[in-house]
């Protein structure tokens, strides 16, 4: 998965010390965490299949910087407060535009600056349009300049090339800076 590779690359290359990553599904949370842990990035998860005790422990370990990354679903992350959280990543674009606001609201709290970054595959553009409509702004999109995905698109099903996203197959993301001015 190119998004997994890009996430691991950005965490390491840009030296992100504490990152909250949002996934649309519980299964997605575990897959992302498995990939990051295999890449040597200490990662925990919180989602609906975890007991309250396990979610509390994972959150405590993330706040205590035992985990560098915490991967969460929207529902499991509602109401959590992490002071001085520098990075939020929308690994999957949220289905509902209001969830985007809740997600990026986890960073840039109490006068601190923070960055929210959204990864987007070609089939998620409809979610971006919904967010832009709600916020009444155009969110900038870019490809990560030092991440080089495979140039040749893979084929699936009937031999047709599968899209890897905009800009010639490079995964795209958007970055929002937040500060409490």
List the model feature ranges, each with a label:
Residues 1-151:
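Conserved helicase RecA-like core
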Residues 150-181:
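Intrinsically disordered, Lys/Arg-rich low-complexity segments
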């Amino acid at each position: 998965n190119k998004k997994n590779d890009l996430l691991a690359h950005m965490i390491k290359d840009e030296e992100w010390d504490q990152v909250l990553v949002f996934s649309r599904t519980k299964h997605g949370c575990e897959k992302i965490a498995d990939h990051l842990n295999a890449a040597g990035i200490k990662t925990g998860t919180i989602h609906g299949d975890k007991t309250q005790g396990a979610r509390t422990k994972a959150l405590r370990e993330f706040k205590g910087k035992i985990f560098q990354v915490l991967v969460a679903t929207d529902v499991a992350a509602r109401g959590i407060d992490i002071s001085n959280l520098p990075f939020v990543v929308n690994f999957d674009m949220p289905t509902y535009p209001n969830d985007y606001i809740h997600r990026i609201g986890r960073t840039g709290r109490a006068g601190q600056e923070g960055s929210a970054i959204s990864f987007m595959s070609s089939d998620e553009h409809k979610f971006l349009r919904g967010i832009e409509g709600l916020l009444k702004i155009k969110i900038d999109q870019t490809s990560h300049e030092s991440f080089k995905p495979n140039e040749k698109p893979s084929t699936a099903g009937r031999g047709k090339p599968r899209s890897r996203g905009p800009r010639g197959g490079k995964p795209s993301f958007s970055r929002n800076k937040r500060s409490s001015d």
